[in-house]
Amino acid sequence: GAPVWSAPTLDRLRGLLFYGTGENYSAPATDTSDAIFAVNIETGKRSWLKQFTAEDMYNLACNVGGANCPEQEGPDLDFGAPPLLARNSEGRELLYVGQKSGAVSALDPSTGERVWDQKFGRGGYLGGVHWGLAADIKRGLLYVPISDFPAGLKLTGVPTPGLYALSLDDGSLKWFADKDFSEENRKKLGFWPGLSAGIVATDGVIFAGDLAGQIEAYDATSGNTLWSYATARSFATVNDFESKGGSIDSHGPLPVDDLLLVSSGYSGVGMKGGNAFLVFQLDEQSDVELMEEQ
């Protein structure tokens, strides 16, 4: 079978539930892996299925061997990011999906037909696109975080981690905010600075946390960095314990009212472990002038 790594997306207008799947855990491979599903919410029956990578068989437990492990190891190109339903500049509603390969596509939500396709980065265990996309309908942009962490099967090409802004209409690139993965900067930060965690788009600002523990705010129109804060360090806490931050992965930053909530510390795949929950105060005077740590 194939896993479902992320939350489904509900389309009440069409009566459909969308979700993405990962690789097959065992042979033989099926046509339901590395795919996007649309399921009728009344009957539970499949409305359509769109597979992006065929014959992808990989099981993490098989790194130590096993009798039922697939002989052919696939590239492990899950859909970890939930499908995103948004309207383009023409008012057409499309389903936007991103894969660990770095592939980004817009689908017709009624049929699964591919409207446009793009690819950014080289992909890997942590993406490509790993845990989440974001959209800004007012600006007509889709925001795509790319990790390109150098671990995974069959990696080829040059990594290009960072935040990409694409047109919701045709997928064309509007701006790119790169992450400096030079050896010098990696030594300075202590880890790879790619964007694996989910991101969030607010009115004018994109919040993203990276694998090196940096939390950053980007201008939604230009991609310029407005604010950056290093969380991979020790903190005094309100409950009188010393806590330490680390890599930011999986769930990303969360704005709630006038606060920004950040969870820092993730030790998977050799990342920087930790367990710090940070709360920042957003500046009320501007949507791009930010914030102080609490």
Residues of each region from the PLM?
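Extracytoplasmic/lumenal domain signature
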Residues: 1, 11-17, 26-79, 84-130, ...
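Short, well-ordered beta-to-alpha junction loops that form the rim of enzyme active sites
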Residues: 21-23
